[in-house]
Amino acid sequence: MGFEDGFYTILHLAEGQHPNSKIPGGMYASSKDGKDVPVTAEPLGPQSKIRWWIARDPQAGDDMYTITEFRIDNSIPGQWSRSPVETEVPVYLYDRIKAEETGYTCAWRIQPADHGADGVYHIVGNVRIGSTDWADLREEYGEPQVYMKPVPVIPNVYIPRWFILGYEE
């Protein structure tokens, strides 16, 4: 199932956490500092003004998307970008030109999680032999940051999950 281009909120699901769109709370992807900074997360509800434009990127392949922040004032700080070679590094919010200059890439594979819950997805970065790099959340310098986590492709290993919900004005 693919995404329609549109505005969404992106909620990190901790291991064992189940999504509930009726109860605000949890760690929502944000970028309170603007562009060229790591993507962070804040404990905000779905009524938050943080919104992400998720759009197909057919040139990058099937189920590949860009994730771009739009602010209330309609400014666009940038897109989720990741290193094409490094793992366990923060996901940055770069504009496309900056991403191309640094060698970082902007497309992500967003695929349904196998937990049977609607709206629960994996956000996948680099794919290498024997492992895949997944977007996850960790505490870094006193604040939660989105980062790339290598997870071996073996049974019963926890894979980071995100609840992606259509943004409502």
Curated annotation (Swiss-Prot):
Q: Does the keyword Nucleotide-binding apply?
A: no
Annotated keywords = Protease inhibitor, Thiol protease inhibitor
Recorded GO molecular functions are: cysteine-type endopeptidase inhibitor activity
- Family according to the record: Belongs to the protease inhibitor I85 family.
Q: What does it do?
A: Inhibits papain and cysteine cathepsin endopeptidases, and also inhibits cathepsins B and H, which exhibit both exopeptidase and endopeptidase activities.
The protein's name: Macrocypin-1a
Protein's organism: Macrolepiota procera
